[in-house]
Amino acid sequence: MQDYAFRRLREEPLLLALLTYWEGKRGDREVPDRRDIDPTEMPPSLLPHLCLIEICEGNRLKVRLVGTEIVRQHRRDNTGKFADEYLKGEYLAYLTALYLDLRARRLPVLAESRFRHIDTQLETTRLLVPLTMGGADVRLVLMGQVFRYRSGQANAPIAQPLDAGLLEVLNQIPLDRVKRAATPPPPPSSEADAPS
């Protein structure tokens, strides 16, 4: 599954740019902090596809920021709202489990799902990366999201909110390969290894 996930990321340059940026910001740490993130350092084409979610008390998800492409595709701006204020049922349960799993693992997650509506079908790929908020606990998730319509359909938002359709979860893959030790490599063990 890891090979598949990284192949999908190579096929989605915006999501790969987010992962590369996140890895650069974390350095030797397991997870970067929110204060390390500066949108002006990101590719401008990525910004409309970003969403910042806070995991609050009681495991409620609060939308802190939503990019314009996500607003356009979802047909609403949920900035400042809790997910349970505008989502219900299966979709809310899916998203909550996705974010809580990321928090527990402290790893990026690639998630793919499909929404089926009467007149259209849409697939979406999300890359979720964890962030701390001034402490050790993962409290924020920075998500990049891209949308793909079935062949022959316009890349325009559907006539109703995404969650009004039937949800099909395709993949949810923690990216274990990006986890690395926080300790630097040992120095050369002998004089033969040292540069002359």
Task: Go through each PLM region and give its residues.
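Intrinsically disordered, low-complexity regulatory segments
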Residues: Q160-S196
